[in-house]
From Swiss-Prot:
Protein name: Dihydrofolate reductase
PANTHER family per UniProt: DIHYDROFOLATE REDUCTASE
TM region positions: none
Function: Key enzyme in folate metabolism. Catalyzes an essential reaction for de novo glycine and purine synthesis, and for DNA precursor synthesis.
UniProt GO MF annotations: dihydrofolate reductase activity; mRNA binding; NADP binding
Record-annotated DHFR domain positions: 7-210
UniProt miscellaneous comment: Present with 1080 molecules/cell in log phase SD medium.
Residue pairs linked by disulfide bridges in the UniProt entry: none
Family the entry assigns: Belongs to the dihydrofolate reductase family.
EC number: 1.5.1.3
Keywords: NADP, One-carbon metabolism, Oxidoreductase
Superkingdom, taxonomy of origin: Eukaryota
Length: 211
């Protein structure tokens, strides 16, 4: 990416088929293998001299238990209209506060391009809705309950129509190539998909690229 912009990647787990991403500000599931995937994908890089930035809204930041934040080995960028400044960097804690998504990305591009491999956007719903025009890729974990009668309630959704209009799902080989080599993927299933079953859910790791 020498001379180019830092790739922007949306990463999210979605309940199928409506692409539900949350309920009452949280998630109705706790899937350790999915959380491990998220941690590895966003922490690891192909270039050992670079790191990744995570952009999130204030509510997403506050939903992370205090003992786990900032998320380690990543630049944590929190955006909120309540912040006065365009960009405030706490270098010691690797935390940035910005008053808008546009200002956050502009400053990351201007000041950290040589040090960042990717910018991951991790939520919440309002932030996801703003990034379809600027995102290069989406990493979507597609989640299905094993018992269709036990489908959890959702009140926040990814815009599935916009996703399908602008992005196309890639095959599993392209997902593997896209990820840093140390990310641990499950064995592929009979359809050559990267899928797992855990705690009453089946979930599949997928990559979408801009058309």
């Amino acid at each position: 990416m020498a001379g180019g912009k830092i790739p922007i990647v949306g990463i999210v787990a979605c309940l199928q088929p409506e692409m539900g991403i949350g309920f009452r500000g949280g998630l109705p599931w706790r899937l350790p293998s999915e959380m491990k995937y998220f941690r590895q994908v966003t922490s690891l890089t192909k270039d050992p001299n670079k790191k990744n930035a995570l952009i999130m809204g204030r509510k997403t930041w506050e939903s992370i238990p205090p003992k786990f934040r900032p998320l380690p080995n990543r630049m944590n960028v929190i955006i909120s209209r309540s912040f006065k400044d365009d960009f405030v960097h706490d270098k010691e804690r690797s935390i940035v506060q910005s008053n808008s998504l546009a200002n956050a990305i502009m400053n990351l591009e201007s000041n950290f391009k040589e040090h960042l491999e990717r910018i991951y956007v991790i939520g919440g719903g309002e932030v996801y809705s703003q990034i379809f025009s600027i995102t290069d890729h989406w990493l979507i974990t597609k989640i299905n309950p094993l018992d269709k009668n036990a489908t959890p309630a959702m009140d926040t959704f990814l815009d599935a129509k916009k996703l399908e209009e602008v992005f196309s799902e890639q095959d599993p080989a392209q997902l593997k190539e896209f990820l840093p080599p140390k990310v641990e993927l499950p064995e592929t299933d009979c359809d050559q998909r990267y899928s797992l079953e855990e705690k009453g859910y089946c979930f599949e790791f997928t990559l979408y690229n801009r058309k």
